[in-house]
UniProtKB/Swiss-Prot annotation:
Molecular-function GO terms, alphabetical: arginine deiminase activity
Name of this chain's protein: Arginine deiminase
Gene this chain is encoded by: arcA
Family: Belongs to the arginine deiminase family.
Catalytic residues as annotated in Swiss-Prot or TrEMBL: C401
Entries under Gene3D superfamilies matching the protein: Arginine deiminase (1.10.3930.10), L-arginine/glycine Amidinotransferase, Chain A (3.75.10.10)
Catalytic activity line of the entry: L-arginine + H2O = L-citrulline + NH4(+)
Alphabetized SUPFAM superfamilies for the sequence: Pentein (SSF55909)
GO process annotations (BP): arginine catabolic process to ornithine; arginine deiminase pathway
């Protein structure tokens, strides 16, 4: 059995990637949090405890949970994989010329466990086994990072997107996140969990390459939903560009992987950075949505054209909710709106009330703090499993953001 492929948003979830908070989050400060795309610093110990609870609740449902730091450690045990990463991460463009050879030699000899910790957590000048020197070394000062930390690996949804029987490795919008794509690509290419299937053609990389400059064609997985029945929803807001959507659609159509892409043009805002921050699938016909944003989304339908490489494009008059229902072959969706009065709705959307992960049809994991929205979901027949979001949510992501499904069943309608 091929244990890869995501064929819906709510079918039985069987295998998922997560990334627990760690060293990168310990390096967050009030001074650098915004640059690293966090709104606040975390109580890291509590965040790790809450993340473990999240993982255990998925495992209790029979889901195989793969921790990204562990995957990376197991990947860099392979000398070829280690070289592949370091050739791209430790070069003149990244660390200058003065310390390049010493830094590379140190990392070449490092244990796989410590190297994986540093690749995600970053390396400060204090941790170097030699005195910083050269232009770059002196520029960093006493508290700079030779390799910046990657705290947003907590949200592995974004750096790659499994779409039916393949995956995109996404060129991300903000520089603070772009190295994530290199690391996840290495895992898919070299890790024993993935490499045999990749080499056998059991799954394909549809689009994206960390060796290429994609320019303004940026994409992040929080905008990408393998909706089912050959359809894909892709948000276009703060992080995912129309150039990327067009390229992804073209590759999917060329490979026969999808028959329709619904591009969803969203307002560009921090609170609605991805489609999944305002819209999540919870049950066969149930979604939760922040309608203040969803009602403003302009949708476009892309389909394969009559000739090779051609895409038919149509600006839609229908609402996102109706198009999503049409893709599933059902009359309409039961839309559970963000709960509470005007103020509470805005607060709960900000706290990821509409960013839930379905473990199977009608069962989701949500943050405990979003009591109004969770109550409405339960009234709609959805089982809501809660985890604490007080610390984990400080990076603006809920259960949907904190998971990258790699194997999920289809749903029949």
């Amino acid at each position: 059995m091929i244990e890869f492929g995501v064929h819906s948003e709510v079918g039985k979830l069987r295998k998922v990637i997560v990334c627990r908070p760690g060293l990168a989050h310990s390096r967050l400060t009030p001074g650098n949090a915004a640059q690293l795309l966090y709104d606040d610093v975390l109580w890291v110990q509590q965040a790790r405890t809450d993340h473990m609870d999240f993982c255990m609740k998925m495992e209790s449902r029979g889901i195989k949970v793969l921790e990204f730091g562990q995957l990376l450690e197991e990947t860099v045990r392979d000398k070829g994989a280690r070289n592949w990463i370091l050739d791209r991460r430790i070069n003149e463009n990244q660390v200058g010329v003065g310390m390049l050879n010493e830094l590379r030699s140190w990392l070449d000899d490092m244990s796989a466990e410590q190297l994986a910790i540093y690749l995600i957590g970053g390396i400060s000048v204090h941790e170097l086994p030699f005195k910083p020197h050269g232009m770059f070394g002196n520029y960093l000062g006493g508290d700079g990072f030779v390799i910046p930390p990657l705290p947003n690996t907590q949200f592995p949804r974004d750096n790659s997107s499994w779409i039916y029987n393949g995956v995109t490795v996404n060129p991300m919008f903000w520089p603070a996140r772009r190295p994530e794509t290199l690391l996840v690509t290495a895992v898919y290419r070299f890790h024993p969990e993935f490499a045999p299937a990749f080499n056998n053609g059991d799954f394909k990389i549809w689009w994206g390459d960390p060796d290429l400059d994609h320019g303004p064609a940026t994409a992040e997985g929080g905008d990408v939903m393998a909706w089912g029945n050959g359809s894909v929803l892709i948000g276009m807001g703060e992080r995912t560009s129309p150039q990327a959507v067009g390229q992804i659609a073209k590759r999917l159509f060329e490979q026969g992987a999808a028959t329709r892409v619904i591009a969803c043009q969203m307002p560009r805002s921090r609170s609605a950075m991805h489609l999944d921050t305002v819209f999540s699938h919870c049950d066969r016909d149930v979604v939760t949505a922040f309608t203040d944003v969803c009602d403003e989304i302009q949708c476009y339908t892309l389909r394969p054209g009559d000739h090779a490489g051609q895409i038919d494009f149509r600006k839609e008059k229908k609402h996102l909710f109706q198009l999503a229902a049409d893709c599933l072959g059902i009359k309409k969706l039961n839309v559970v709106q963000t709960g509470g009065d005007h103020y509470q709705k805005e607060r709960e959307q900000w706290d990821d009330g509409n960013n839930v992960i379905a473990l199977e049809p009608g069962v989701v994991v949500a943050y405990d703090r979003n009591t109004y929205t969770n109550t409405l979901l339960r009234k709609a027949g959805v089982e809501v499993i809660t985890v604490s979001g007080a610390e984990l949510g400080r990076g603006r992501g809920g259960g949907h953001c904190m998971t990258c499904p790699v194997w999920r069943d289809p749903v029949s309608y």
